Amino acid sequence: MMIKIICSAQAYTYNAYHIVKAFYPAVEITNHVEEKASNYVEINFSDGQVIAVEKEEIKAGTDAEKKAQIDKKLYKKLSEKSGKTLAWGILTGVRPTKLAMKKLEEGMEPEAFVSWFRQTYLVSEEKARLAWEIAGREKKLLDRLDYEDGYSLYVGIPFCPTVCTYCSFSSGALEDWKDFVDAYVEALCKELAFNGEVSKEKKLNSIYIGGGTPTSLNARQLERILSCIDTHFSREYLLEYTVEAGRPDSITEEKLQVIKAHKVTRISINPQTMQQKTLDVIGRKHTVEDICRTYEMARSLGFDNINMDLIAGLPGETALEMKDTLEKVGRLQPDSLTVHSLDRKSVV
């Protein structure tokens, strides 16, 4: 089966494509603009069936109002044809909690939000309530930040033990750059010293050391960076200090002890998957057992705020394997879990 989308204007193509894709995720879809088309949006199925949002169906209004009407009409017609509904309705390309947060800050009451969200975006009641709940949690955290004088510090370590096959980050394999790592660390410490000086009148709220894989550095190099941060930055207003410990094959007890000694409050151990065949495919040089061992080692050293990262949609993985990964990680009981979805980009 194939689906061809014809839109009368470029402005309608993005939402039309993603709404159709949500109903038919496994189907090949093409998107076309025909300015003289008789309908705002027309969906042509390979079996000859056609769904159209006709111009006569849409009331006059602003461009945004017309787009919203078109999206709703398209959704309802696709829902009738497929017999399905989408939990997040017509939402595409926006975080639901961003919309909920805006209404929360405007003073909207919970039930009024649920009604507005469902009517505006055709979201299910369950998801509307979830968006409101998460926005409330986020607001409690964000209200602790000082938006006038506060700031956050990010320290990037652009090295990894190896580069995973899916990765497009600006990082390189440690073996290829080993002769430059010490020089990078020293240059980084100079930059940290400078930034500590120019921001000393500000309030440091959070520190995040990421990458790359920060623990691809040896213990001495990690110690140098963490000591430099201790020297040049005040912790008086610090709410969170994270080191992305990263891959189990780069984490050692010595490195964790260095991190712990500098009073880092949160680490992230990132398996990405608990499927051994996938780890092998993506170029990870460690086992599922290594993940569990490293996690337990961190717990034994007193780390009480451990995040774990997963990626949905890794090459060859099924929904059942993702479910198995979530169950295995759940048994470890990390303090937080971050799930990314793999975005396959084409290179022209």
Predicted regions mapped to residue ranges:
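Canonical Radical SAM [4Fe-4S] cluster-binding loop centered on the CxxxCxxC motif
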Residues: 148-183, 280
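Short beta-strand motif preference
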Residues: 41, 52, 155, 267-269
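N-terminal [4Fe-4S]-dependent radical SAM core
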Residues: 78-85, 105-153
